[in-house]
């Protein structure tokens, strides 16, 4: 079974969908779909990740500059990769995610 996280980047009017599928060897296939040209390199480069990639931020390929390519520093696609993989391996509850919805970032009106 796969786990999918959808992101609506309202600040740039782009959408990202990340699907993680855990394989028998414990690695994850990653499928990234987006209408953003800047994410194409990221999607083509990040097809497979390991458990270490989702648990060790310092060595994770998810955030490596050569993998991120032209993406903006504030792009939520890498966070969606973490969330989809965490959900797929049971580190984030699918039931709670379905019940409560996604993690959101909102503008604070003062």
Predicted regions and their residues:
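A short linear-motif detector with a strong N-terminal bias
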Residues: 8-10, 81-85
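Active-site- and interface-proximal helix/loop "cap" or "latch" segments in soluble metabolic
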Residues: 22-83, 90-97
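Predominantly soluble domains enriched in secretory-pathway, periplasmic, or organellar proteins
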Residues: 100
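Short terminal or interdomain "cap/linker" segment that borders an active site or interface and mediates
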Residues: 106-110
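Short, charged/polar N-terminal "headpieces" of proteins
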Residues: 1-28
């Amino acid at each position: 079974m796969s786990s999918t996280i959808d992101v609506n980047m309202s600040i740039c009017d782009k959408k990202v969908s990340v699907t993680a599928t855990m394989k028998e060897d414990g690695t994850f296939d990653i499928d990234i779909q987006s209408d953003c040209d800047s994410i194409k390199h990221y999607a083509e480069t990040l097809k497979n990740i390991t458990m270490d990639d989702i648990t060790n931020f310092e060595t994770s390929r998810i955030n490596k500059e050569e993998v991120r390519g032209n993406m903006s520093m504030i792009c939520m696609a890498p966070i969606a990769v973490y969330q989809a993989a965490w959900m797929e391996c049971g580190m984030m509850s699918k039931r709670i995610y379905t019940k409560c919805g996604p993690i959101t970032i909102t503008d604070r009106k003062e």
